[in-house]
C-alpha cells in the first residue's frame, strides 16, 4: 500500500513536471516529456501519446515508449512514429463511434478508462494488443487511458499507460491515486500543449505575414524579392558558423533557439521598407529608365534629325546646290548621328565607370544638336535631366535616386519600431536596421561604428552585401563569379565596411561554398 510520503513525493514530481512542460518550446520534445512524466508518476512500463487529427477523425500516434521491450518511437528517440503505426479511426465505416477501441472511446467521450487486465476486459476490442503480445512475448495487462483536455475543455489527445509496476509484485493495477495524478498531468499537459501549438500558430502566422510583405516587394520587383529570401538563408549560415567557433574573439558567441528565431525574423524583415520605394527606381536597369527606358525617345529624335537633314538636302538641291555636295553633307550628318546614337546607347547601360571624355562627349551631343519638340519649340537635343542621368559616373542611379533607395532602411526602422515586439524579439529592429552601417561609422542611416552594433546586425550586413554581389536576377548585371565576389568582399573588409572577425569566419568556415551550392549557378562557382 502506498504511504503518505510516497504520495507527497509524486505530487511534488507532478508540480515539477508542470513547470518543466511550460518551458519546453520544441513540440516533439514536449510530447515526449508529457509521456515520460506520466510513466514516471504512475510507474508504468509503457505508454502511448496520441493527438487528435485536424479533421477530428483519427488519433495519430506521436510518442511510444515501452521500457521492458526497449521500444521508443517519436520525440528524441531518433525513430519517427509517423508511418510506423496506423492512425486510430474514431469512427467506423458506417459513421458510428468506434467505441470498441479504448483510446478512441476516451477521445470521443472524455472519460478515463482504468482496466485491471486487458485480457479480461469486456466492451473493448484488445485483439490488436493480443497480436502485439504474441509477436513480442510481452503481456499487456493493466491499462490507464486518460483524455487530454485543454483550457477550453476540448479534447486534443489521449494518454494511454500500460502495466503499472510495483517493485515488490511486478505488474499491478493502476490505483485511484495513479488515475488522479495521470488526469491532473494530462490536464496540465493539454494546456501546455495547446499553448505551445498556439504560439507555433502565431509564429507561423507572423512569418507568413513577413513573407507577404516580401511577396509585395517581389510583385513590385522580381529583382529584390529573391534578395529578401536569400539574405536570411545566408545570415543563418554565417550565424551557425560563428556559433560553432571555439577560438578567437567569437569563441564566446552562442545562439539559443530563441536567438536563432529572433535573428531569422530580423533577416526576413531587413528590407521591409522597400515597399515604400518607387518600383522604377528599384528596377532602374539603365540610366534613362523611368517607367520606360527613355533611350528610345533619343533614338526617335535622331531619326527626326536625319529626316530634317534629308529635307534640307533636297531643298538645297532644288535651290541649285551641287547634288553630290548636298548628298555628301547629308550622309556625313547621318553617320555622325548614328555614331552618337551608338555611343549614347552604350553609355545608358551604366556597366562601366564613366570616363571624363565620355562625360564631355555626352554634354557636347546635348548642345550641338537642336530639334523641335511636339510643341514646336526649338530645344537642345538632350534635356538637363537626361544629361544628368547619362553622365552618372557609375551604375544607373542619380544621387537623388540613390537617396531614395537608401531611404528604405529609414522606412524599415520606422516600420519595425512601430511594432510591439515581445521580449524574445526585442532586438529585431536593431538587427534589421543596422545592415547598412559600416565599421568606421561612414554607413547609414545612423553612422554607427563597430562597437555600437550587435554581432547579429553585422552578420546581416555581410549577407546583404554578398547576396547582392552574386545575385543573378539584378537588372543591371549578371551574377558575379564567386572569386570576384570574394575579392570585393575582401576589399569591403579592408575599407572597414564589414566586420573583420565575421569576415574571417565567413572564409575559414567556407560559408560562401554552402551558399554557392544552394543558390548560385554552376558557371558562377569558379573557386
Task: Report each predicted region and the residues it spans.
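A short, aliphatic-rich beta-strand micro-motif
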Residues: 141-152, 157
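Divalent-cation-assisted or electrostatically stabilized phosphate/pyrophosphate-binding catalytic cores
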Residues: 173-177, 213, 283-311, 386-416, ...
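Helix-loop-beta substructure at the N-terminus of cytosolic sensory domains
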Residues: 15, 23-75, 97-102, 224-225, ...
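Signal-transmission/dimerization alpha-helices at domain junctions
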Residues: 1-4, 108-112, 158-159, 167, ...
Amino acid at each position: 500500500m502506498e504511504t503518505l510520503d510516497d504520495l507527497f513525493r509524486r505530487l511534488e514530481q507532478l508540480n515539477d513536471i508542470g513547470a518543466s512542460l511550460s518551458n519546453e518550446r520544441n513540440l516533439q520534445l514536449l510530447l515526449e516529456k508529457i509521456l515520460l512524466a506520466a510513466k514516471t508518476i504512475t510507474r508504468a512500463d509503457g505508454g502511448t501519446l496520441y493527438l487528435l487529427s485536424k479533421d477530428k477523425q483519427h488519433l495519430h500516434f506521436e510518442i511510444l515508449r515501452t521500457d521492458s521491450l526497449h521500444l521508443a518511437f517519436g520525440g528524441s528517440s531518433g525513430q519517427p512514429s509517423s508511418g510506423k503505426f496506423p492512425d486510430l479511426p474514431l469512427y467506423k465505416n458506417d459513421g458510428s463511434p468506434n467505441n470498441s477501441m479504448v483510446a478512441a472511446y476516451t477521445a470521443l467521450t472524455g472519460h478515463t478508462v482504468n482496466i485491471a487486465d486487458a485480457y479480461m476486459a469486456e466492451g473493448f476490442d484488445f485483439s490488436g494488443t493480443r497480436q502485439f503480445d504474441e509477436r513480442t512475448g510481452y503481456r499487456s495487462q493493466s491499462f490507464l487511458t486518460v483524455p487530454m483536455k485543454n483550457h477550453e475543455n476540448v479534447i486534443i489527445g489521449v494518454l494511454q499507460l500500460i502495466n503499472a509496476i510495483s517493485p515488490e509484485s511486478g505488474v499491478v493495477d493502476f490505483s485511484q491515486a495513479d488515475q488522479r495524478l495521470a488526469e491532473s498531468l494530462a490536464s496540465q499537459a493539454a494546456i501546455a500543449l495547446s499553448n505551445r501549438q498556439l504560439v507555433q500558430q502565431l509564429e507561423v502566422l507572423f512569418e507568413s505575414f513577413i513573407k507577404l510583405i516580401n511577396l509585395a516587394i517581389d510583385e513590385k520587383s522580381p529583382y529584390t524579392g529573391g534578395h529578401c529570401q536569400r539574405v536570411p538563408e545566408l545570415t543563418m549560415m554565417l550565424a551557425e558558423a560563428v556559433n560553432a567557433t571555439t577560438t578567437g574573439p567569437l569563441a564566446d558567441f552562442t545562439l539559443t533557439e530563441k536567438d536563432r528565431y529572433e535573428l531569422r525574423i530580423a533577416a526576413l524583415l531587413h528590407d521591409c521598407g522597400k515597399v515604400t520605394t518607387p518600383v522604377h527606381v528599384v528596377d532602374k536597369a539603365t540610366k534613362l529608365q523611368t517607367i520606360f527606358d527613355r533611350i528610345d525617345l533619343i533614338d526617335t529624335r535622331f531619326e527626326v534629325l536625319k529626316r530634317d537633314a534629308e529635307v534640307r538636302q533636297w531643298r538645297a538641291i532644288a535651290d541649285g546646290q551641287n547634288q553630290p555636295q548636298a548628298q555628301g553633307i547629308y550622309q556625313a550628318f547621318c553617320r555622325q548621328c548614328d555614331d552618337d546614337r551608338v555611343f549614347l546607347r552604350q553609355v545608358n547601360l551604366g556597366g562601366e565607370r564613366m570616363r571624363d571624355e565620355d562625360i564631355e562627349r555626352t554634354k557636347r551631343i546635348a548642345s550641338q544638336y537642336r530639334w523641335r519638340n511636339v510643341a514646336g519649340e526649338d530645344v537642345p537635343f538632350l534635356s538637363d535631366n537626361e544629361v544628368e542621368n547619362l553622365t552618372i559616373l557609375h551604375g544607373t542611379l542619380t544621387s537623388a535616386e540613390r537617396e531614395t533607395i537608401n531611404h528604405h532602411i529609414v522606412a524599415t526602422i520606422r516600420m519595425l519600431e512601430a511594432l510591439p515586439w515581445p521580449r524574445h524579439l526585442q532586438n529585431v529592429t536593431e538587427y534589421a536596421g543596422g545592415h547598412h552601417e559600416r565599421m568606421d561609422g561612414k554607413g547609414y542611416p545612423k553612422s554607427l561604428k563597430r562597437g555600437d552594433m550587435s554581432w547579429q546586425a553585422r552578420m546581416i550586413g555581410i549577407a546583404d552585401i554578398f547576396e547582392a554581389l552574386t545575385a543573378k536576377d539584378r537588372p543591371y548585371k549578371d551574377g558575379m563569379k564567386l572569386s570576384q565576389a570574394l575579392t570585393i568582399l575582401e576589399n569591403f573588409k579592408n575599407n572597414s565596411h564589414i566586420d573583420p572577425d565575421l569576415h574571417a569566419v565567413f572564409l575559414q568556415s567556407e560559408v560562401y561554398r554552402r551558399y554557392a551550392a544552394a543558390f548560385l549557378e554552376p558557371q558562377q562557382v569558379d573557386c
